[in-house]
Amino acid sequence: MTLAGGALFGFWYALLLVSFASSIGATLAFLVSRVLLRDWVQERFGRHMGAVNAGFERDGSFYLFSLRLVPIFPFFLINLLMGLLPIRPWRYYWVSQLGMLPATAVYVNAGTQLGQLQSLSGIISAPLLGSFVLLAVFPFMARWLLGYMQGRRALAAYDRPQRFDNNLIVIGAGSAGLVASLIAATVKAKVTLIERGKMGGDCLNTGCVPSKALIRSARVAQYARRAGEFGLAPMSVEVNFPRVMERVQRVVETVAPHDSVERFTGLGVNCVQGDARILSPWEVEVNGEVLTARNIVIASGARPRVPDIPGLAQLDYLTSDTIWDIREAPQRLLVLGAGPIGCELAQAFARLGSHVSLVTHASRIMPREDPEVAQQVLDAFLRQGMDVHTGYDPVRFTADEEGQRCVFTTAGDRRELAFDRVLLAVGRSANVQELGLEALGIGLTRAGTVAVDEYLRTAIPNIFACGDVAGPYMFTHMASHQAWYAAVNALFGRFRKFKVDYSVVPWATFTDPEVARVGLSESEARDNNVAYEVTRYDIDDLDRAIADSEAHGFVKVLTEPGRDRILGAVVVGYHAAELINEFVLAMKHGIGLNKILATIHIYPTLSESNKFLAGEWRKARKPERVLSWAERYHRWNRG
C-alpha cells in the first residue's frame, strides 16, 4: 500500500497521507487491545508484569521507537502488545509516527519512482536503481542509527573528559584481563591493569595450576599402588601431605613469573594494585586516585559459590580458593557438588588418603555430559573406594563434641554423614560487587554475570566485559578467547567490530579417566531435535593404550546424517584432553572424518584412536554394490 501511495500521489502527498494513516490505524489497534485485553492480562499476570511495567514506564518510548525504526517484528503484533503496557495513547501515536517516518519515506520514494516508469528501459534508470538500493540498505542504516542513539543515550548523563590518561583500563588480572592488557600494549595503546589480589587470578593461584599439580601427585600415588601391574614389586604408598601441598605451591611459584607485574610492565602495561570502582563510562577510582580511559574492560572473574545452608556458616568450610592453605589431609572429606571442580578434587584427595563422600543434588555426577560418559567416571570413583550420593540435598550442618555432620534428604530418604572437613564445589558466582555497575545501569543476567551483547559491550557502549564475570563459559581458555574480542572491539570498534565466536568450545574434566568434549553431546542433540549419526571407538583395543596399561574409555563422534561433518566429539580415557584437540581443529576449519582418516598418525600413539574412529565411520558406510563388483572382478582375475 505504501508503494501504491507513492505511485498514485507522488512523494510528498503520499508521505503525508501514508504517515498519518498508518499512525492513526496503529493507534486504533492499540486502543482496541487496551480496552479488550489490558485489564485481563495485568490481573492474570500481575506478578510477572510488575518489572515489565516499571521498565516500560522508564524507557517505553525508546523501546517503541526502536521497534518502529527497525521493523523486525510485524507491526500488528507491536500494536497489540503496546496496548497491554503503560504508555499513553498520545505518546504512542507520535512516537509511532516519528519511528515509522524514515521507512515510510523510503518506501514512498520507491513507489514514486515506479509510478514514473514510461517503458521497460526506465527500470535501469538512476533514480529507480537508487530507490532499490535505499530499500536494501535502509535496515542496516536504521540499525546503525539505533545503535548510535542508544550509545548517546547511555552516555548523555555523564561529562566526558577532554583528554584521557589511557586508551584502555582493564579491571582484573586473571586470564581475561592479562590477555586484554597484552593485546592493548601490543598495538601500542596505553593501558592500565588493575588487580586487587594476586596477578594471574584464580587460574594461577587457586584454580587450574594448583589443581593440576595436586592431581598429578595423586596420580603418581595411584601408579605406585598399581606397581604390580607394571611388573614391579608391590609398593607401600605413604603420602606426605604437607610435602604434596608444598610441591603444589612450588609449581604455582614457578608459573607465576609468566603473569607477574614485572613481565607485564616490561611489555608496556601499567599495573596497579588496588580495588577498582567505575565512577563513569570513562573514570575508574583506585587507591583514591581517579584514572580516565576512552574504554574500560571488566575482567574481574568469579568466586566459589557458598550455599545458604543452616549451620554451614559456623563451620570452617573449604572452597577451591581456600583448600590450598591446608597442610593436613582430612581423614573424612565431604565434597558438595559433582561438577568438574568437585569431581577432580574429590578423586585427588581420595588417592591421597582421605575417605571421600561426594554428594550432589543432580541425578548423576557430571550432569553436562552424556550418561555413559558420567558412568565411566563414576565406576572409577567407586573402584577407588569413594562414596557417591546423587539426588541428595543438604539441609543442615551440625557440630558438637562428637564431630561434624550433615543431614541430606531426597524423596523418601534421609541420611546423615559425619565428616572432618567439607569442600564446597557447587558452582561459581561472578565478581560484580563494589564495581559501581548498578549506579551506571549495567545489568546482570539471570546467572548473575554482567550482561553483554555479541561484541561483549555492556549497556554502556564503551565498557566491555569478558571472562568468568561475563560468562557463559567459565573456562580459562574461553576467558582468553573473549579477551581478544573485548580488547579489539574496545580499541578499534569504531572501524570494525567482531562478534564473539562460540561455535567451537572445547573443555575437559581432569579426572581419571579424563573427559574432554567439543560441540554437541548426544543428549544435547536429542533435546534440541538435531539429526545426527553416532560413531564410537573403544580405546581398550588400542595398541598404545594396552602397552601403557590404560586400555579403557572411548571416543564418540556425532556427524550429520550421510555426511562426515562433525557436530560434536567426546573422548573418555587417558590423556583425553590432548586427544580432543584434533576434533577441535577439524570442527573449527570444516575438516570431516574422511580427511582425518586420510591423515597419517604416528604408531603407536593414543591419537590413533581418532583415526580408528574415522575408520569405523567409513566402514559403516562402505559401498556394498561396488565391493560386490570388486569381488567378481578379483574372482575373474584369478582365472
Enumerate the language-model features and the residues they cover.
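N-terminal Rossmann-like FAD-binding beta1-loop-alpha1 element of flavoenzymes
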Residues: 166-193, 342-351
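FAD-site-proximal beta/loop scaffold in flavoenzymes
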Residues: 313-328, 416-496, 578, 582, ...
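Glycine-rich dinucleotide-binding loop and its adjacent helix/turn
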Residues: 208, 300-359, 384-388, 438-440, ...
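A conserved FAD-binding loop/helix module that cradles the flavin
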Residues: 369-376, 466-526, 603-625
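A Rossmann-like FAD-binding core segment of flavoenzymes
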Residues: 234-235, 270-273, 277-285, 291, ...
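Glycine-rich flavin
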Residues: 182-189, 194-329, 362-366, 372-373, ...
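Flexible, glycine-rich terminal cap/loop adjacent to redox cofactors
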Residues: 171-173, 185-197, 202, 209, ...
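Membrane-interfacial helix-loop-helix
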Residues: 19-79, 84-90, 118-119, 140-154
